[in-house]
Amino acid sequence: MTESREPHVAGSAAPRPEPANGLASGQPSSRARYSRVLLKLGGEMFGGGQVGLDPDVVAQVARQIAEVVRGGVQVAVVIGGGNFFRGAQLQQRGMERTRSDYMGMLGTVMNSLALQDFLEKEGIVTRVQTAITMGQVAEPYLPLRAVRHLEKGRVVIFGAGMGLPYFSTDTTAAQRALEIGAEVVLMAKAVDGVFSADPRQYPEAELITAISHREVIDRGLRVADATAFSLCMDNGMPILVFNLLTNGNIARAVAGEKIGTLVTT
């Protein structure tokens, strides 16, 4: 399973009662600009820069998501698996690409289950749906069921990518957002947004606050893979690229505050 680099289950535990999430199954709070969002999380952030999971990072992300869910916003999530495996990189080391991509998909499921656990510790009922059937740990991906979960105030995490090799989790995020009727893809990164050049190599690079899908593709800006941007461009799906490492930024993104980079058609 591939996932672009940063720029520049139902679980086995006994079912828990539905929490009293305030507006979770009703209308979003007046502060929210969006009522249904698809949050794309890079797997590398879940590892805190290392291989594996950093529980402190996952817990912090879960708290941010729980905050917006309690405000009535419907949240679906796609997570990469880069903290465990990257199919393209394994291919470069001699592995067969299809097999290495499937290994990456399993990494996304591990991340999904971890986030589910921390969200439920926050009192947020969460379902994991996977594109590859694994009934003992997650539901199969069914878009209509996912929408029903969202309407009931549950978080839905989509694992195993598209279930197909050669497709990145960025592309999965775009496709799932369109299929569940999300209003925006919130693309969480480890940088403040889209820059004119890689800010780690070029300190003078400027943050771009607004740009079109077409310009991102034409300029070759490394935000997500071109397939994901083309899919969003063709279907008028906006993308907000923002820094996940700033606490509270998910709520700011949902509220429509001017953070990061807004990519529109």
From Swiss-Prot:
A single MF term (Gene Ontology): UMP kinase activity
Catalytic activity: UMP + ATP = UDP + ADP
Region (Disordered): 1-29
Enzymatic class: transferase
Pfam families in the cross-refs: AA_kinase (PF00696)
Coiled-coil intervals: none
Residues the entry annotates as binding UMP: G81, D101, M162, G163, L164, P165, Y166, F167, S168, T169
UniProt activity-regulation remark: Inhibited by UTP.
Record-listed E.C. numbers: 2.7.4.22
One GO BP: 'de novo' CTP biosynthetic process
InterPro entries listed in its UniProt record: AceGlu_kinase-like_sf, Asp/Glu/Uridylate_kinase, Uridylate_kinase, Uridylate_kinase_bac
GO cellular component terms listed in the entry, alphabetical order: cytoplasm
Subunit organization: Homohexamer.
Family: Belongs to the UMP kinase family.
HAMAP family: PyrH_B (MF_01220_B)
Protein name: Uridylate kinase
Source organism: Mycobacterium avium (strain 104)
